[in-house]
Design a protein with these regions (language model features):
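Hydrophobic/aromatic-rich alpha-helical bundle segments in the mid-to-C-terminal region
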Residues: 105-109, 138-188, 196-199
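Alpha-helical DNA-contacting segments of helix-turn-helix folds
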Residues: 56-62, 119
């Protein structure tokens, strides 16, 4: 039976994700990935330049959605309600966790040794800079709001987001419990931003 190139590539990615989840990036070997995928190591290199590229390809959907959170902060397109709309925020967090739980585990806990091992701190710094610029744009649209919020607080707010994701990944909870916890977190967040911004 002849396998299509796309099928082989998908098989490699599926096998690699299993190995990464079991061993983490650092201890996963190309030999084991090849064995699990039923191909030779040299065959893997027809599709991926190295182990890092495989890892990044697996995590691409997770990374795309996280970066979308940053690049969707366009003051020209958004209203102040983005900070106050708890239903929208609850849905976003819930869907993100449900869709990416295993891959979030890879990114947050098993990326040591990969090009993504410092992703959390790099993302936090980028989010802090982006939100600061976003606040300037929002101030022009809503002159009454307070944007005198320290960069360190914005930084901490992103750190808390990762803490939320970590806890939900580490502790498998029933759907109802997760819904309640996310609702509590978002209620706390939206009330806090409303108070800080005098919105």
């Amino acid at each position: 039976m002849q396998f299509l190139k796309g099928d082989i590539q998908e098989g490699i990615l599926k096998a690699a994700e299993e190995v990464f989840l079991e061993k983490g990036y650092k201890d996963a070997s190309m030999r084991e990935i090849a064995s699990r995928a039923g191909v030779t190591v040299s065959n893997i290199y027809h599709y991926f330049t190295n182990k890092d590229e495989i890892f990044r390809t697996i995590l691409k959907p997770v990374l795309n959605d996280l970066y979308a959170m940053i690049y969707n902060h366009d003051a020209d397109q958004m209203t102040i309600d983005v900070f106050m709309d708890s239903d929208y925020q609850k849905m976003s967090v819930r869907e993100y966790i449900s869709e990416h739980r295993d891959r979030l585990r890879l990114l947050l806990f098993q990326a040591q040794g990969s090009v993504l091992e410092n992703f959390r701190s790099e993302y936090t710094d980028l989010m802090t800079r982006t939100i600061s610029v976003f606040f300037q744009g929002m101030k022009q649209k809503y002159p009454h709001i307070n944007i005198a919020i320290t960069n360190f607080f914005i930084h901490l707010n992103t750190v808390w987001l990762f803490a939320l994701l970590e806890e939900l990944v580490l502790h498998p909870v029933k759907k109802e419990e997760m819904e309640k916890f996310i609702a509590e977190y978002i209620a706390f967040e939206t009330a806090g931003w409303k108070e800080l911004m005098n919105a």
